[in-house]
Amino acid sequence: LFYAQPLLQYNGPRMTSKIWSGYCLDVWGDAGKEVILMGIGFETTTPTVAAAILSARRRGVDNFSVFSVHKTVPQAIRALIEDPELRIDGFICPGHVSVITGVEAYRMIPKAGRAAVITGFEPVDLLVGVLGAVRQLEAGQAEVQNAYERAVTFEGNLPAQKIMNTVFEPVDRK
């Protein structure tokens, strides 16, 4: 094997990309250098970042920070509903997010007269979702249909919601 020697030595900040927030805390949290985790994502990633923050607090790690740019799917949908230039008749709601939020999080969709179907990501799941939305629209109905019952409950993942609400405070990013 041939290993190239770097021509320049870089001694500045180190950046690494990790998909698990606990890794940043476990590997770098006690290294003596400032660790800044950029928390990106929706309800599916937010609970793990919240858990890392609480773990850092419990362990007394003071060099671990989070720059959170998390978003919430229900608020994104609300913004789409409230935009007067958009005329969206229905929504296919993401199953992975809905596992956390539950069906209940989408109650504003039928209140706005729009169809909504929660689906998984398999092709047949998506087709069932589109069919469900079309049937609602043809019947003049507006409801939240859970077509992903094998994973999504009405109330969602309450422990995940609790940890998110303990650590993060929703703010408007307009």
Question: Which residues fall in each region the model found?
Answer:
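Glycine-rich oxoanion-binding loops at beta->alpha junctions
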Residues: 2-29, 73-74
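A generic structural signal for alpha->beta connector loops
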Residues: 11, 32, 61-63, 87-88, ...
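Conserved beta-strand scaffold positions in the cores of enzyme catalytic domains, especially
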Residues: 14, 66, 116-118
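Membrane-interface helix-loop-helix junctions at boundaries between adjacent transmembrane segments
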Residues: 26-38, 52
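Phosphate/pyrophosphate-binding betaalpha-module
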Residues: 38, 42-105
